[in-house]
Amino acid sequence: MGKRIPMFYLDPRSVSTHAMAMSNLGPSHFKGFELSNFQRKAAAALDTDHNVLVAAPTGAGKTLVAEYAIHLATSQGKRSLYTAPIKALSNQKFRDFTEDEAIPSVGLSTGDISLQSDSQVLVMTTEILRNTLIEDAESLANVGVVVFDEVHFMDDPERGSVWE
């Protein structure tokens, strides 16, 4: 039987202040931002090698948790994959990550574009990740984190099968 994957599911709407105070919280700041309780809890889970699924409203700070995971993997010498459902979002995240001085190299793979595919952080569409898993899974051996942005697309009738 396969290894059990530890996971935390964090919904900031259901995390009480008291429960957070009684549990192990991660760092209080990251990239100049003060982290909310759910972000700190997610960081603590990531610090202890747990997988994290964050469900939160727009603007609640999910991206900062994803960036924390990527920085953590980078500090451990691992690669990171950041997936997005559409090319435009992949292109935007590529630009964002290239401006992050803590990330040594950033690549992009969208089907139309393939730049530096051996980079520390590789931004790609979800279809590219699926194809890589099927055709070249060994190339993912040193991956420490995979971020699925806009995971609610799993429920999309036209695109959902890619996420499954």
Where are the language model's segments positioned?
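Conserved P-loop/Walker A NTP-binding site and adjacent catalytic elements of P-loop NTPases
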Residues: 32-164
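Helicase-associated low-complexity/disordered flanking segments
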Residues: 1-52
